[in-house]
Amino acid sequence: MIEFGNFYQLIAKNHLSHWLETLPAQIASWQREQQHGLFKQWSNAVEFLPEMTPWRLDLLHSVTAESETPLSEGQLKRIDTLLRNLMPWRKGPFSLYGVDIDTEWRSDWKWDRVLPHLSDLTGRTILDVGCGSGYHLWRMIGAGAHLAVGIDPTQLFLCQFEAVRKLLGNDQRAHLLPLGIEQLPALKAFDTVFSMGVLYHRRSPLEHLWQLKDQLVNEGELVLETLVIDGDENTVLVPGDRYAQMRNVYFIPSAPALKKWLEKCGFIDVRIADVCVTTTEEQRRTEWMVTESLADFLDPNDRSKTVEGYPAPQRAVLIARKP
């Protein structure tokens, strides 16, 4: 059983304590009514994993845990098998005692693009919205964050996160809650808020920006990473039924348009930090994610377009501040 008591105890003593007015009831409701049909199977995989204490832990350059002496073949096989029960693994990679999880996304590449543009994370309390398996939560801790909280309603991601946590010595500096941003009160408590790969899935993107702003302290920093298209501040793509085979893509603005949206929502010091095309080296099929990936979503005769004829995915990072 995945429990959240440690997180409740942690925030009871800090500036997030007012979250306890709503959070435990939301989690209890989720545990009673909303669990996925495979959740028991996934949580059993976490339960059967050994709790390991790394001899060497690197969260600064990667997410890597090593033991002082190599694990036996049987120990490695047990860990490998249990982690494979949590497939597909989309966000990573992770290297855990000789088991290398080669995820669909090279999320480390994204982190390397984002990190140079951030304010120093040392001592910060961070929220990562739509955090997936929590890979970037661990990298935030590696960069000096005091506490990294992720929210993502996808229950497989919660189990993947808890599996990794167990293999990292039950580290309590990062936590993942099975919630969406719309379930959070206006906490106004986080020094940095990340929203990476979420905005284009929102029916109302400006409402999402307001929700992110409501989580920040005054002078807090927003890190927004999302799909963009080429164009000026008035350019926005509204795809038809699908974009790159995804049904739930609503608005893809240009980077200048997105900057304008952020300013309209009251953010200041907005800057476009990075724009890059997503490659099939960064997002691809692996033995840990065996279904279709980016290469299958692009026009085989023109890789600059999706199979639907839209511009191929490119992603921008924008940094902004709440006044």
Curated annotation (Swiss-Prot):
Its EC number is 2.5.1.-. It catalyses: carboxy-S-adenosyl-L-methionine + 5-hydroxyuridine(34) in tRNA = 5-carboxymethoxyuridine(34) in tRNA + S-adenosyl-L-homocysteine + H(+). Disruption phenotype: Deletion results in tRNA having 5-hydroxyuridine (ho5U34) instead of cmo5U34. Pfam families: Methyltransf_9. Keywords: Transferase, tRNA processing. Carboxy-S-adenosyl-L-methionine binds at K91, W105, K110, G130, D152, P153, T154, I181, E182, M196, Y200, R315. InterPro entries: CmoB, Mo5U34_MeTrfas-like, SAM-dependent_MTases_sf. One of its GO terms (molecular function) is transferase activity, transferring alkyl or aryl (other than methyl) groups. One of its GO terms (biological process) is tRNA wobble uridine modification. HAMAP family: tRNA_carboxymethyltr_CmoB. Catalyzes carboxymethyl transfer from carboxy-S-adenosyl-L-methionine (Cx-SAM) to 5-hydroxyuridine (ho5U) to form 5-carboxymethoxyuridine (cmo5U) at position 34 in tRNAs. PANTHER family: METHYLTRANSFERASE, TRNA U34 CARBOXYMETHYLTRANSFERASE. Belongs to the class I-like SAM-binding methyltransferase superfamily. CmoB family. This is tRNA U34 carboxymethyltransferase.
